[in-house]
């Protein structure tokens, strides 16, 4: 079928522009597509510093990163591309700011405002006329806890946010250096201390990102909430997605993720999120810098992380910093007097009525552009600003700042006739001699105009784009960083490889077949898109796979009748004829296990073999090739299978005794990929009754500053099946508690009960006392698809015995062999016969044209090989 891909040539055009600029000595060199970053990010001069609570701002095209550093000085680093960072720069030695917590900076009208909480003892505001300082304290202690953050809304009103024991608070700032009366924002994690707030606005929606609960716990994590009413209106936490960043399991020694900031990257369109992780080396706890992308599906935000492997470099929009002596061939000036000053900015020094400088590379018909300008010192009037949709000297459009009247003015020149089309007031104490920015977002015929990051208007323009540049009328003006990009409204994410493991929204396919349709899906605060596919339709994604492994997928979909799909990695079928049962029109998740993916960059395609299905998203997680069985009878001691232990657990009289609160999780990190299994145990409660099994457990953690098992009792992502005084209960824990099913039954202390949970796909069956019929059965519409197993007590001391956790397997009836190599294991198969490998549970892994080639592909594990004639052999690869 023909392929539909609206963005096929965009990135190639960007690289072409950049190669031309490198030859013409413009500011930004070409960046290779695969020269990216790997978390944690190590910046020059960082090694001796703690990098916590990072915040990034952009000023005149340069990114400035500020952070808590546990030093006597406040520091920042600078970068143009988010890859290459400067040495650490001391931005303040003010004695009041020693050990400043979470310094955050906002630029406004020529002044940089920093808010920080020295030693966590209340907030001070510092100011500077430079992003690199020196910042000086200009207020007394304004208090308001820690982790202060400032947001400026489109009307110019400033808002202040901060941490609190009962959740994030916000208030309207009377001035730039004072705080107002707090409002609770309904953003509290587990009813506990919540910190690290940050607010930004996108397409009329307010997004609040926040962190909890304690910086020194592995389960330090990030949630987000949304509202459409205002910066300090009541926010709605996005419970279905939260937490959006967590790594309590500590894969790659990466845990304790929290407190960061969102910002737009150098392609002018893609969002990024910088945050910190925790590491412990040589007995020292240190925070490190991490960076991941944010993807947008309509109004829905998705964090593409956390990642610990090399990611694609940020795409850099064609741009100019004027850091050279001559203007160069990429600029055309048709009036005025233009020159570069101090290799820093472009100056227009005449009083010409219509002085223009045109940036030769053309914008797309759909584009984002950024411009930086100021009125020259000593000037008080005139108009200056951005030139766009430039076709020739008689056909163009302008977005101008009127210095004398503090207005934004939009002009159109058509066939030599120039017309003022709209005027908008600029907010606040507008100072024309300070650096200001104009941002244009043009999508088809819709144009959004921002001044200093604030939306001034959304208007309708023609479909055609054109060149961009700078213009002044009857005044001298200076111009700085300019950039243009073919991306707008989140489209830039389609030209990078999406990280796997991770989440793939169906609508973020790079390519799609003809006939595959996008449909709007209503959210409580906006819309996103889903993909409707019928027979032979397909979607294809560019992905970046962490390593060659088996992976599990949770495919979220709906279908009125059964359908079948296949998955391809590159050109190879990795799953064929996968059944998607009918869902009756409701959303459900179909687990697809044991998908073998190569490491690095490849494509993933999903094809509909038959049926009619609507796809929402795909969650891909690490699998395991060799699911193990774990058992412990606690006869003389607790065995070494228990790898995550909270509180003090002891072997007592042939049983394992729990603390009053705590979790004990079996298995190693490789077992997190286990999907379908049973877990069972004898449980005796000795005081109070609230204990049982946990399964498909991910990211278990304690809570609070002192490894508090009470605070951490719900700190896991997984399921619980247990007993209480008067009921059996099945619950879902996602750093909180949701009851899924329960049944009344009386239970008594000092009496043993046998609990067993069998989880297969999205269905959980719970058994009591070896009864043949499950006492509870539940199918989760949004399940955890894999994870470890263990036990848990809650306000109850319990005794556990005869623990067993075993994968669900389908016996092949084939005798196993363990050979010395591929040739040995392949012996007995026709060398010309195609052979397919399956897991012991019957899932197809991959196929090849003969057994020797196939065996060379397989990871360590146990497989069943079958050829086209039905010959079969169980093989062990070690």
Model features per residue range: what roles?
Residues 275, 371, 551-555, 602-608, ...:
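Extracellular beta-strand-rich recognition modules
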Residues 5-19:
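Bacterial N-terminal signal peptides that target proteins for export
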Residues 299-547, 573-592, 598-601, 619-810:
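Extracellular glycan-recognition regions
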Residues 33-194, 201-206, 210-251, 266-271, ...:
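Beta-rich carbohydrate-recognition and catalytic domains
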Residues 563-572:
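Short, surface-exposed beta-strand/strand-loop-strand elements in extracellular ectodomains
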């Amino acid at each position: 079928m023909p392929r539909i891909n609206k963005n096929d040539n965009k990135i190639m055009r960007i690289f072409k522009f950049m190669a031309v600029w490198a030859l013409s000595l413009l500011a930004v060199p070409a960046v290779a597509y695969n020269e990216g970053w790997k978390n944690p990010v190590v910046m020059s001069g960082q090694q001796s510093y703690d990098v916590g609570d990072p915040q990034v701002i952009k000023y005149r095209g340069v990114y400035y990163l500020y952070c808590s550093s546990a030093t006597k000085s406040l520091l920042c680093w600078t970068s143009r591309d988010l890859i290459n960072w400067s040495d650490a720069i001391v931005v303040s030695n003010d004695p009041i700011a020693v050990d400043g917590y979470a310094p955050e900076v906002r630029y406004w009208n020529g002044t940089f405002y920093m808010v920080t909480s020295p030693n966590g003892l209340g907030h001070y505001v510092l100011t500077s006329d430079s992003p690199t300082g020196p910042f000086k304290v200009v207020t007394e202690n304004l208090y308001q806890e820690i982790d202060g953050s400032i947001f400026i809304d489109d009307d110019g009103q400033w808002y202040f946010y901060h941490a609190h024991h009962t959740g994030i608070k916000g208030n309207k700032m009377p001035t730039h250096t004072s705080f107002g009366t707090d409002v609770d924002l309904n953003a509290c994690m587990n009813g506990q201390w919540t910190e690290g707030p940050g607010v930004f606005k996108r397409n009329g929606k307010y997004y609040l990102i926040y962190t909890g609960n304690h910086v020194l716990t592995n389960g330090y994590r990030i949630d987000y909430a949304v509202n459409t009413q205002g910066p300090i209106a009541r926010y709605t936490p996005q419970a279905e997605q939260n937490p959006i960043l967590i790594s309590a399991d500590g894969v790659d020694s990466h845990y304790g993720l929290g407190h960061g900031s969102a910002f737009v990257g150098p392609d002018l369109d893609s969002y990024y999120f910088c945050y910190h992780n925790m590491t412990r080396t040589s007995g020292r706890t240190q925070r490190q810098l991490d960076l991941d992308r944010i993807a947008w599906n309509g109004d829905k935000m998705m964090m593409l992380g956390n990642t610990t492997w090399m990611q694609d470099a940020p795409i850099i929009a064609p741009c100019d910093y004027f850091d050279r002596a001559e203007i160069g061939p990429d600029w055309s000036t048709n009036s005025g007097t233009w020159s570069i000053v101090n290799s820093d900015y472009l100056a227009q020094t005449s009083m010409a009525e219509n002085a223009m400088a045109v940036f030769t590379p053309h914008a797309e018909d759909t584009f984002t552009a950024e411009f930086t300008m100021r009125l020259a010192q000593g000037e008080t009037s005139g108009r200056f600003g951005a030139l766009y949709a430039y076709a020739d000297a008689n056909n163009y459009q302008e977005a101008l700042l009127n210095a004398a009247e503090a207005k934004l003015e939009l002009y159109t020149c058509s066939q030599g006739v120039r017309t003022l089309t709209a005027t908008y007031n600029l907010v606040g104490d507008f100072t024309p001699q300070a650096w200001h920015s104009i941002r244009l977002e043009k999508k088809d015929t819709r144009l959004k105009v921002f001044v200093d990051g604030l939306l001034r208007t959304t208007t309708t323009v023609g479909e055609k784009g054109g060149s961009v540049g700078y213009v002044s009328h009857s005044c001298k003006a200076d111009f700085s960083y300019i950039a243009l990009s073919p991306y707008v409204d989140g489209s830039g994410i389609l030209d990078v490889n999406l990280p796997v493991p991770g989440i793939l929204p169906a609508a973020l396919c790079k390519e799609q077949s003809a006939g595959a349709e996008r449909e709007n899906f209503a959210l409580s605060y906006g819309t996103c898109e889903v993909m409707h596919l019928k027979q032979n339709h397909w979607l294809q994604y560019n992905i970046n796979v962490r390593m060659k492994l088996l992976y599990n997928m949770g495919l979220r979909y709906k279908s009125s009748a059964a359908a079948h799909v296949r998955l391809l990695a590159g050109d190879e079928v990795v799953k064929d004829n996968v059944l998607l049962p009918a869902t009756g029109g409701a959303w459900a998740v179909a687990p697809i296990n044991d998908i073998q993916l190569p490491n690095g960059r490849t494509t993933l395609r999903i094809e509909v073999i038959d049926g009619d299905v609507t796809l929402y998203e795909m969650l891909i997680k690490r699998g395991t090739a060799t699911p193990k069985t774990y058992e412990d009878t606690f006869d003389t001691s607790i065995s070494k299978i228990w790898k995550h232990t909270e509180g003090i657990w002891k072997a007592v009289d042939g049983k394992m005794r729990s603390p009053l609160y705590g979790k004990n999780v079996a298995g190693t990190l490789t077992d997190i990929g286990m999907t379908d299994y049973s877990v069972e145990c004898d449980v005796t409660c000795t005081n109070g009754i609230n204990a049982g099994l946990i399964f498909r457990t991910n990211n278990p953690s304690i809570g609070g500053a002192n490894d508090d098992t009470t605070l951490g009792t719900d700190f896991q992502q997984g399921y619980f099946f247990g007993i209480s005084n008067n009921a059996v209960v099945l619950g879902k824990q996602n750093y909180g508690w949701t009851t899924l099913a329960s049944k009344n039954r009386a239970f008594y202390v000092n009496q043993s009960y046998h609990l067993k949970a069998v989880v297969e796909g999205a269905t959980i069956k719970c058994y009591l006392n070896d009864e043949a019929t499950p006492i509870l059965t539940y199918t989760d519409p949004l399940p955890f698809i894999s994870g470890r197993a263990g036990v848990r007590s809650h306000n109850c001391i319990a005794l556990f015995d005869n623990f067993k956790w075993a994968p669900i397997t389908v016996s092949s009836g084939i005798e196993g062999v363990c050979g010395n190599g591929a040739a040995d294991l392949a012996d007995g198969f026709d060398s010309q016969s195609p052979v397919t490998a399956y897991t012991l549970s019957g899932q197809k892994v991959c196929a090849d044209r003969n057994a020797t080639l196939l065996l060379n592909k397989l990871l360590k594990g146990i497989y069943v090989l079958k050829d086209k004639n039905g010959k079969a052999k169980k093989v062990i690869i070690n």
